[in-house]
Curated annotation (Swiss-Prot):
It comes from Homo sapiens (Human). This is Protein virilizer homolog. The gene is VIRMA. Belongs to the vir family. PANTHER family: PROTEIN VIRILIZER HOMOLOG. Residues 132-302, 576-596, 1616-1635, 1663-1812 are annotated as: Disordered.
Amino acid sequence: MAVDSAMELLFLDTFKHPSAEQSSHIDVVRFPCVVYINEVRVIPPGVRAHSSLPDNRAYGETSPHTFQLDLFFNNVSKPSAPVFDRLGSLEYDENTSIIFRPNSKVNTDGLVLRGWYNCLTLAIYGSVDRVISHDRDSPPPPPPPPPPPQPQPSLKRNPKHADGEKEDQFNGSPPRPQPRGPRTPPGPPPPDDDEDDPVPLPVSGDKEEDAPHREDYFEPISPDRNSVPQEGQYSDEGEVEEEQQEEGEEDEDDVDVEEEEDEDEDDRRTVDSIPEEEEEDEEEEGEEDEEGEGDDGYEQISSDEDGIADLERETFKYPNFDVEYTAEDLASVPPMTYDPYDRELVPLLYFSCPYKTTFEIEISRMKDQGPDKENSGAIEASVKLTELLDLYREDRGAKWVTALEEIPSLIIKGLSYLQLKNTKQDSLGQLVDWTMQALNLQVALRQPIALNVRQLKAGTKLVSSLAECGAQGVTGLLQAGVISGLFELLFADHVSSSLKLNAFKALDSVISMTEGMEAFLRGRQNEKSGYQKLLELILLDQTVRVVTAGSAILQKCHFYEVLSEIKRLGDHLAEKTSSLPNHSEPDHDTDAGLERTNPEYENEVEASMDMDLLESSNISEGEIERLINLLEEVFHLMETAPHTMIQQPVKSFPTMARITGPPERDDPYPVLFRYLHSHHFLELVTLLLSIPVTSAHPGVLQATKDVLKFLAQSQKGLLFFMSEYEATNLLIRALCHFYDQDEEEGLQSDGVIDDAFALWLQDSTQTLQCITELFSHFQRCTASEETDHSDLLGTLHNLYLITFNPVGRSAVGHVFSLEKNLQSLITLMEYYSKEALGDSKSKKSVAYNYACILILVVVQSSSDVQMLEQHAASLLKLCKADENNAKLQELGKWLEPLKNLRFEINCIPNLIEYVKQNIDNLMTPEGVGLTTALRVLCNVACPPPPVEGQQKDLKWNLAVIQLFSAEGMDTFIRVLQKLNSILTQPWRLHVNMGTTLHRVTTISMARCTLTLLKTMLTELLRGGSFEFKDMRVPSALVTLHMLLCSIPLSGRLDSDEQKIQNDIIDILLTFTQGVNEKLTISEETLANNTWSLMLKEVLSSILKVPEGFFSGLILLSELLPLPLPMQTTQVIEPHDISVALNTRKLWSMHLHVQAKLLQEIVRSFSGTTCQPIQHMLRRICVQLCDLASPTALLIMRTVLDLIVEDLQSTSEDKEKQYTSQTTRLLALLDALASHKACKLAILHLINGTIKGDERYAEIFQDLLALVRSPGDSVIRQQCVEYVTSILQSLCDQDIALILPSSSEGSISELEQLSNSLPNKELMTSICDCLLATLANSESSYNCLLTCVRTMMFLAEHDYGLFHLKSSLRKNSSALHSLLKRVVSTFSKDTGELASSFLEFMRQILNSDTIGCCGDDNGLMEVEGAHTSRTMSINAAELKQLLQSKEESPENLFLELEKLVLEHSKDDDNLDSLLDSVVGLKQMLESSGDPLPLSDQDVEPVLSAPESLQNLFNNRTAYVLADVMDDQLKSMWFTPFQAEEIDTDLDLVKVDLIELSEKCCSDFDLHSELERSFLSEPSSPGRTKTTKGFKLGKHKHETFITSSGKSEYIEPAKRAHVVPPPRGRGRGGFGQGIRPHDIFRQRKQNTSRPPSMHVDDFVAAESKEVVPQDGIPPPKRPLKVSQKISSRGGFSGNRGGRGAFHSQNRFFTPPASKGNYSRREGTRGSSWSAQNTPRGNYNESRGGQSNFNRGPLPPLRPLSSTGYRPSPRDRASRGRGGLGPSWASANSGSGGSRGKFVSGGSGRGRHVRSFTR
């Protein structure tokens, strides 16, 4: 055959499919490099194909005589497309039609053939693209991963990700052996995981082996080939399966074939890890090992020569595969990671831009359609409009007014058409003239009565219509003076309110365009602006409707002005930043370095860094604060816009409440988006997130996030993001940058990206982009086109990939539940389920299966039931139509309660009845409808959170009445109880919350039930006229909180759990409203009201069971008010202060009734060695003491009693024994003494003035005696350090309830001191004790440092200094001893003691105003400065105190000077110390002879302290600051700090056998374990495991279970032989390790729950044990908490309280120390804050892991800076050492109180799952 000279024969071969009947077949031709295809020929039977072939292969064998052959090709110009493109079809007829020529020369590296043939001989002609083939030899560059469905040339695929994402494709076809030649399209995507009808995956099949080798005839290249085999199932199961194969293959060829090329590219990079796996995979699947030599062939190709290999080895022959994948194999595939970072937004399709007017949209639609598309509606409207304009050029009578009324309806279609077609005719100008005449009062007055009002109203409506005609319309109106015209109308006399409202509507339309707003705000020369005129109008005596309408316009103006101001600040920032000198960057880095290396000074460094940033950018803190306020204002205005910025309908009346009436009519958001667009708001936000000075500011981040989050909640907001797609792409990149940074550092960023908002926003916009593609696909495609179109499948596949991680899943659920988005999937399903398509064809369509899965995911994960209201009927109809589809049947179960349901108040009884009937099926596959029923009930009966300016809708009150009458309360309590009973068992065994679906269902049910209960109880108890004594509610809530919200300290509650905790707290707090103020309060009524009963339940639950300790304490802490004073930037009104104080008194009263329980709690936990519980106890004690004096005395008495009992428990004659219990009690007392209320209660009790409390004064003296003689035992040393720290708190006058303030009438200094310091007798003994400690050579370094700092506190005022001098007279050698010790032990580590001691001496020498803090600023200014001191010690007296007989102080100072000088060579920090030494030495040298201390001083007499009750009543309730101090705002309590404790000290011998016989004699361990581990917990979408499986064959659930996700709890038995996703996925497999045993050597990956280790499999195989679904077998204890969390402990958004706060500005997490080994060690050395691998399965399909519970080991010391209670602690004088030297690694530095004393931050242990 003649072949064109430019062409060569690329391929010639015969595909055979011997089969009894004719059916559709698919074959693949793969070229080893890129080729251009010019022609494809089908060789008829008997025709010689090629002259140079041997006879036995030279002739065509094609049969039958005619058939249609479809061809698809891999488009190499779109490397990222997930599907093959269609090449075309050949209607083959052996007599007439055998040649197919593509329309253009196609370059490709693979073809797919499909047709109803049994045998096909095919020749392909074309040319080789040498260049490209050369390129392909080297691996492609690694840019970002999976692209958006529209192929974008700019986006290349990241090989690292391409694979795993594809690997799982739909339902995740298993990681199959990839033949490197002719490719087999894998099977239909989301197959239904029907048990009875598993969809076969045509992965590969029996290749017809064609006779001898064929290498002799290939011309230039030899594409290896392999006919696509049929799986056994196909031929066995007849027609339906074949159709399914055909249908599946058809789109699969579309969807999947190219994927395999990507895998191949990856193979090149995976270095020899594959061959063995594939070989094993084959054998292990129990298939025949037919082709050993093939595998050898594989071994020879190494990754770097892959591209060339095929060209060189023309004889190379590929093995064929006949692998049948079972459901089990599918489930064992490691999860694919979906990397969203590559997907960029593209211009908006289908939907229109949210800020464009209807007129603008119509114009752009006409332009797009082009002039040829005749639009009859537009033509008619334009003709009519032209007629009207021509007809009434002069006439201004009744007909003209009628014409004016008709015009608005013609403008959109008619005027737009005229403007496009007939540009010369000035219709718009004429309309503007008419409008101005219609608004003219003079013209109106000439009209007959009634007609004149019609004319004015028609004029205002015409203004609104023309204002919508884009810039042209508004500009025309403005030039004609429309604003003045409208104001004339508004200011005119005798104009009715309704006409004024019309005028306001017109004005509103004008300012809704930015040009109009500019004109309105500016005004013309020498004329008031529209804004000023409007204010004047409102200030006149107007009706309420007119004022409301005017206010709405003012609100819009304010919004516009705020945006203008933000833009101004943004431009200013941009200019300053661009003009910055370059050197600012390196400075920043050095700071950061300093911060890392020296954790002790972290706070200072951070502050200096911020200052450097501020200075370098010339941006003042004030400007940043202003920016934050403006952003917050934007958020507030947008939130309230629907109630404050819309023009009310003329007939409505603004009232406080309404019961009926239309919903809000107007939508303010398009206008606001227009303003945002015109101010380039998204670009500004991106700028703020990119400039270091603003992006590092938590306030800016939080404010921007609030605005963005608000926008992303609505469809229009998302469309706004998409219409500004370029800015959005940059914005998301900037946000993700923070997310990455935080992961890098192992930190949780400050609340901005804490909830993966960046990913959620990205996934939401991507989802909507996919929806726009679906809609535009339906617009373009007609029904006659083939069903599974490649673009359509690409889009659906992308959507499906997004659902693979929890953030993406929630984003998909959210976006599909908005407006009509779900219709896109329903349309698809309705199209495929049409009978016209033929039953089997539609059911096997891939797109249909995708749509089923996606709709199911949306219904499961979205709580927004508005979409169900619209679509439930059509969805139920689809479920009914296809009864064989498991996905749809499951969907039917979810939608069951919606049959014939109207979403109105009347449906409440039916839904509650449904809940009652199904309560026993809770959390089972049959009971999923319960979740839907509860969601609908929430929607119908629970009001949305109130927004300022909103009318109260009384229909919600009616709904609550319905709930009560339908026995809702009882039903919901039963739901909670049932939920608790189901969750308790797995929770006790530390099992995670199950799969994503199980978790979503649990959280959703809990949230809905809690919301309903909250609504009912709030309504019931609000007035105080009802009492509610059903204690099942608090009891169920306490249990639920324990199960869902108690987590180990490294963890944080995620946003869902946080919301559940908030709901639980809110419900419990509603019980505090049920107190009738009018009742007289007696002991009895107090004990029996709802508040007390709720408290009793909560308090008794704390000690009920050990598992509830921690949760109970958190719950109590969350319920109690925060300690005062509040920090604020505004003065708080006296009324609000009294409310705050009264609330605390009420709490105190009700708690006092439960005094015994409170004491029991404090006593029980005081001795705990479990640090989290110790920490929570301290926190609760502080909160209780802060309420009022009775609770403060109660708690402090209890603590002091414990110390008394502990110290007196030893017999009298022996020396007192100090145990570790003593240290814990003193540590508790020390922690409490640093808080105001607790300290004053302690002082009150140890004064010894109250009858019956004398024992406390005695015990205090015992403690002072202990400090004087520390002894050498470690425990005594610890006790001494705690006692000195307690003394320091008692002597700090800043720890006081009444703070000195600069306001008039504030108390005098002496009164202040009398109320905050110990009395005269105590002060004397304390000073004696301090000096004795200094003189004692046994005192520890920390102890000395604390004592010196305490003396510095005392030296600030005459009262303290007087007592110090008195003690110095008694103990004159103390200062000398200390100086000597400082000199003799001086080193870099003890420099702090030397420095403090010198500072103290300088302080007592000096009688001027003391600024002992060095840098007395910050809060000091707020708190009020300390007044001057008159007393002092002169230099001669000091010289006397410092000398002894042996040596003079000058010599000691000289020696110290030498030492300091020597050390300062290495350490610059000692320079200032050197100056102090020299200065003091000179003062002493010049002072002359030493003199004894004078005793001439007058003793300052303090007034008697006020009673504790008075102090509480007059306490400082708030602290005013210029700028919010973020540390104080977010954290009132030191975050949990780990201390290293010598655990051996706390070991107690216990006889467990004896204990078990005594306490649990009837407990049968064997049966309990059997019950726990062999019973199957039910959960949605689970099937029971079959017992006694055969290896490799036991039934496992399919890869996508009922939820569309795999349960991944029970690992498949053969997981260790499945090849891993190549070169990507879970942390680099197969890199230099034995390829077939990756599981034994892998690191732990905490992005998913722990799966079984390979050794467990071996054990399981030998024992035939089935690990149960749901509860992992009790293997090694789980080592680390899998809850992916980050730093800072528990979050809390109730005023920054959670159990340990999310705000972590000053709390660095424990660093993870290297990698955790999977198998060694106990539960990890610390609860390290772990990094969430970005976006990939942190809650994994395999079930999100909850957190570990159980005994909590001591944590490693963390590096951080704690919160210091005293304002002056910020300054250098610091607090005493955190205390115990034994608790700190480097206690030499004596860090401040609450510091985490050891540092070290390192990368967390995750290998990053994604690379950017």
